Amino acid sequence: SSAASDVYKRQMVDNESIALPHYGLSHADVVYEMMNSTLNGRITRFMALFKDYESVDQIGSIRSVRPTNVILAAEWNAIICHDGGPFYVDEYLDEACSDHFSGTFSRVDNGKSREYTEYILSGDMDKNFSSSDVSKDYTSYYEGAHYQFANENNPVDLGTSYPDDAIDANMVDLPFPHNGSYLEYNADDQLYYYSEYGKAHVDPGNDNAQLCFKNLLIQSCGYTQYDEHGYMIFDCISSGYGYYVTNGKALYVSWKKTSMTSPTRYYDAQGNEITINTGKTYVALVPVDDWEDLVIE
């Protein structure tokens, strides 16, 4: 099995404005953003994936988990760190491929109500591992490398590789009405900088660095609403379409996920699995009925 530091930890992070600022997100390897409820302007929640979690002093605030999060965590063989969730998640957390820690982290007095005060602090993960039988190593459910990364000396240039298909992508405005997520391309460092609620998203745990990414994967995804309280699940074990965005260009792609533990794969128009650039990756699941409001320009 792999070294302990190679196993991903996946944290559920609140994205209501009162939960800001978020701690630790700028250290994440992959950040997912998706609708968390069909109510409240289809409010989103972050799911952040950390490999070197031990080097991050504070992550959060930590909130509850949803079925979609459990399914997506399984494709990374990640351990989910959360605080509870609706009963709809139980059958997914009970799957043999799912490992999780719930509500076993630290409280930080930040002057906010209790639901916004739980964080993962240094040492919390070690305590959880020592008091459980959850493995720090990849388990038998790990299906191997997730993305195909380009060599850093030969980065992906969509304009060159797909001259007829790539479009300009200096700004990506996501159809998330509650928080208004958007990413702006900086040609100097070739990264996309994330903003929401009309302002830059900064990490006070990292000198107020703005959240930024090398790769954006935007997926259109159907969903099923469970009840009148807004609880829902994305149809993420399925197939669909989307965009891969990097270095100022976007490429229309298709995606496919065949089982709970199988990684989501992305393909170009010729059916070849795409290669992405080395660096941090942002993944957005966009409800299919909001897809037409996605802006890439």
Q: For the regions a protein language model found, what residue spans apply to each?
A:
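A surface/extracellular/periplasmic glyco- and lipid-processing/surface-interacting theme
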Residues: 2-32, 39-297
